[in-house]
Design a protein with these regions (language model features):
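A solvent-exposed interaction/effector surface
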Residues: 1-165
């Protein structure tokens, strides 16, 4: 049972519109702190070059594979920033997050605890809910910044596409 900070696993079920995301593939670079930081630097530079209001930026991660099924070295993992849907589709590095119904879970705490939170979602919440995961990818939206937030106060919204059982 996930009990970090006595979290309650009750998602908001909501339909979202498709979103475009400028992405950079991470692969196994997350294991190397410097290379991982360089990816984040590239994303923030991309935002700066576009002269957008940094306070409204929504940074996300996209997981295309389940590490419980796919070997870690084959998992596709991306970091990105949500961009205006009116942007040109053919821009390199732009992916679309599908619209549809999502279960949105809020995790408050250190990112290192997310794997336990996911395990509880899949092992406890889904079996008891009226929903099952859909076969498209899930994503995380980071609601605050690690550079200016205590680890125990980091907020991550986890979006898992769902369909009724």
């Amino acid at each position: 049972m996930y009990d970090e900070q006595h979290a309650v696993i009750t998602p908001e079920i909501r339909s979202i519109l498709p979103m475009k995301v400028f992405c950079i593939e991470v692969g196994e670079k997350y294991k190397d702190e410097l290379r991982y930081k360089l990816i984040w630097d590239r994303l923030t530079n991309y935002v700066r070059q576009r002269n957008e209001d940094k306070s409204n930026d929504k940074f996300v991660s996209l997981s295309m594979d389940d590490p419980a099924i796919t070997p870690i070295d084959k998992c596709r993992f991306y970091l990105g920033v949500i961009i205006d849907n009116k942007e040109n589709d053919s821009q390199p590095g732009v992916m679309e997050v599908p619209g549809g119904r999502y279960a949105i879970f809020r995790h408050i705490g250190d990112y290192s605890l997310l794997h336990k939170f996911y395990r509880t979602i899949y092992e406890e919440w889904f079996p008891e809910s009226k929903y099952r995961p859909q076969s498209t990818f899930s994503f995380e939206m980071y609601m605050n910044r690690p550079a200016s937030t205590l680890r125990t106060e980091l907020i991550t919204d986890i979006y898992i596409p769902v369909i009724k059982k």
